Amino acid sequence: MSDFQKSFSESTSSIKFDEKYIDTSVQPNDIGVAEQWAVKTVADPCVGNLATPVNSGYFTKAFINNLPFYREGISPNFRGLETGAAFGYLLYGPFTMTGPLRNSEFALTAGLLATIGAVHILTALFVLYNAPGKAPNVQPPDATVNNPPKDLFTRAGWADFTSGFWLGGCGGAVFAWLLVGTLHLDSIMPIIKNIWTAG
């Protein structure tokens, strides 16, 4: 407990409430089944990290801990490669179908170039995050992620993650571009393009 927290708890310990404002008909044990849904602090309540039914539930913990950023047993470079591939693959569709060249014959290539440009911008932001004086912030364990990866939150780990993200993002965009350019999708491409066409 920090000095501020000690002084705060000491200053509030002498607070007495007027008896007419205290409801004695409800006791903590009266809550019953709803007690399992109560919000509890994970560690320090002043940090604001609370264990709620959403962030500490089984499905949420299983989903978040299986994402490449938090999965155990993989290197920072592979974390970046997998995350970047997902970003590149998923960003290609919106850039292709809603971009300014969506009704031209260059829509697929323009979407590819726009996606690679967005991956470059995100990579530059990751590099800038690692550039200032101190190393990246190490995430403490919380209600959702019990064991965050220690090797990722170092300068070398973050640099490996960034290079993997760039390679995976460009590769994911190229894979989506090749997939959309195949012949079996030619019959549905006009339908998809007409969904977002304004006039």
Swiss-Prot record:
GO terms for cellular component: photosystem I reaction center; plasma membrane-derived thylakoid membrane. It is found in: Cellular thylakoid membrane. Pfam families: PsaL (PF02605). Its main location: membrane. GO terms for biological process: photosynthesis. The keyword Membrane applies. InterPro entries: PSI_PsaL, PSI_PsaL_sf, PSI_suXI. Keywords: Membrane, Photosynthesis, Photosystem I, Thylakoid, Transmembrane, Transmembrane helix. It is a multi-pass membrane protein. SUPFAM superfamilies: Photosystem I reaction center subunit XI, PsaL. The keyword Mitochondrion does not apply. The chain crosses the membrane at residues 108-128, 165-185. HAMAP family: PSI_PsaL. Belongs to the PsaL family. This is Photosystem I reaction center subunit XI. It comes from Prochlorococcus marinus (strain MIT 9301).
